Each structure stands twice: as structure tokens, then as C-alpha cells.
UniProtKB/Swiss-Prot annotation:
Protein name from the UniProt record: Cx9C motif-containing protein 4
Tissue expression remark: Expressed in many tissues with a relatively high level in skeletal muscle.
Family indicated by similarity: Belongs to the CMC4 family.
PANTHER family, sorted: CX9C MOTIF-CONTAINING PROTEIN 4
Length: 68
């Protein structure tokens, strides 16, 4: 049986917040930050819900090194 995603709760909170606020991301920054904190606690690849943040981070690093 697969393990439960350690950051699933925070991901669900983001969905609830977005639905409650007409998908205005700016109103959900606090819950988004909570998910980022959760993702930072686990090794890369451990949480499926964190994969978007991991990809974003990789792209930012690629852009920074390309601009040097």
C-alpha cells in the first residue's frame, strides 16, 4: 500500500482556499507558504504534491546560471 503524501493536507487546504476565494492566488499566500514549508522538510521526490514547487525551483536555478 502506498504511503500517504506527507504534504497532502496542505495541498487540500490550498484547494479549499482557492475555491473559497474565486481562485485568487493572492488571497491564499499563507496556505501556499505552509505547503512550501512542508515540502522543504522532505527530500526531493518524497511528496508528489511538492513536485510543482520542485520543478519551479529547478527552472529558477537554470535561469540564474544561464544569465551569468
Amino acid at each position: 500500500m502506498p504511503q500517504k503524501d506527507p504534504c497532502q493536507k496542505q495541498a487540500c487546504e490550498i484547494q479549499k482556499c482557492l475555491q473559497a476565494n474565486s481562485y485568487m492566488e493572492s488571497k491564499c499566500q499563507a496556505v501556499i507558504q505552509e505547503l512550501r514549508k512542508c515540502c522543504a522538510q522532505y527530500p526531493k521526490g518524497r511528496s508528489v504534491v511538492c513536485s510543482g514547487f520542485e520543478k519551479e525551483e529547478e527552472e529558477n536555478l537554470t535561469r540564474k546560471s544561464a544569465s551569468k
